[in-house]
Amino acid sequence: MLQRSLGVNGRKLAMSARSAKRERKNASTAASKCYVVPPSARGWVHAYSVTATSMLNRRKAILDYLQGAVWVLPTFGVAIGLGSGAVLSMIPVKSGTLIDKLMFQGTPGDARGVLIVVSATMITTIGIVFSLTVLSLQIASSQFSVRLLRTFLRDVPNQVVLAIFACTFAYSTGGLHTVGEHRDGGAFIPKVAVTGSLALAFVSIAALIYFLHHLMHSIQIDTIMDKVRLRTLGLVDQLYPESDTADRQVETPPSPPADAVPLLAPHSGYLQTVDVDDIAELAAASRYTALLVTFVGDYVTAGGLLGWCWRRGTAPGAPGSDFPQRCLRHVHIGFERTLQQDIRFGLRQMVDIALRALSPALNDPYTAIQVVHHLSAVESVLASRALPDDVRRDRAGELLFWLPYPSFATYLHVGCAQIRRYGSREPLVLTALLQLLSAVAQNCVDPSRRVAVQTQIALVVRTAQREFADESDRAMVLGAAARATEVVERPGTLAPPPSTFGQVAAAQAAASTIRSADRDG
């Protein structure tokens, strides 16, 4: 009877444990989808969801660091080379077989010489590759922009080539101690390992040829601009999905209540990323609201204001010190800007290339015009998308977290303002800017965005009237401005492609000059 009672009670306890586990799982699913946490499961769900998501974000941060670390793949290459060399050295090959005829056929001295030559050659090659890599970084920083160094450091083909060379060196060096004599006095030649070293030497030659080919193409300005443009457009698709229309109503952030607690920056640096999901889940579990007032990419000083947090609902009093601290754990501040959540940084990289090209040291206005063409692709996509702030609410509609994003006018200003000022003495650069504004206006749906475009057109016209003493240069820019204004004022008007836009403006300027000369005559 006692055993039967214990068995029944044990089954009941097991059933209740499984039921509680299902309830906790359901509560976690509901919280991750709607950020609504049942009171009975709030503490468990908060601990589980925030911990799991924080681990995911930490993995993302570590992965982003490893992608820009040059030492990671070569280190793996060394480990793989040592391990594979030790394993292949222990593989025996039966004498007289076809495989034996394909293997290395020399003496132990020959095998040792081959391994030494391959190792020494790889050390020299690694030094050359490192020198060429540093040279490419120097060219990128001096000719294009210092903010492009991160793009070069994240170049995977360069890291793979270095890993191949490091693997070959470690493999050949590690195989030297296996060549010698057996304890019984017989000669031992690791034929498989030596043959593998020769094979890796040929692979390294192919990798060196590919590296030179890739390096010569990677430092071309067109390749660099296209890479930055594609990464920026990828971030635009991530933050502003194409499913959102540009005429979607934009919400206005609420004003913090009187008892709101400020969120202060723990140290100085650039606001790199914000874990929106983590903060929303934390706010849902704690019944708080968090509001940031700083854009991602802005520089903040230690103790500077990042945002506000306050208690939601009818619960009186401001949040305790624990919630702001937990909230700030998901706000990442670093010493440099990144392209993880900062579209303006992608625009900044392209603008920096144009500014360096327009500098007196280079004086290359055509490169600046190419940059404007790439900028027009990004700005046109931004003009066609909704640009709402990242707002998270619970199922009842209560605000959980608000992350502000820059407005369309800000993105347009970043892409146009400095190029307009530094290219004020080159009419073709201003004409390219007007073509950009015309293409952007063609994709605008919101009337306020057309106002921003019209403002930039007016600034270009004012610059041309102030800087150009030659009538033909001024007329060329004013003709292009008239065409861009027509596209702004008449939605649906198609802008000419970049290749013909300057020709149309130049023809208009030439006609105006001829008419002026006829009048003077």
Say what each PLM segment does:
Residues 44-64:
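Short, Lys/Arg-rich, polar N-terminal cytosolic tail immediately upstream
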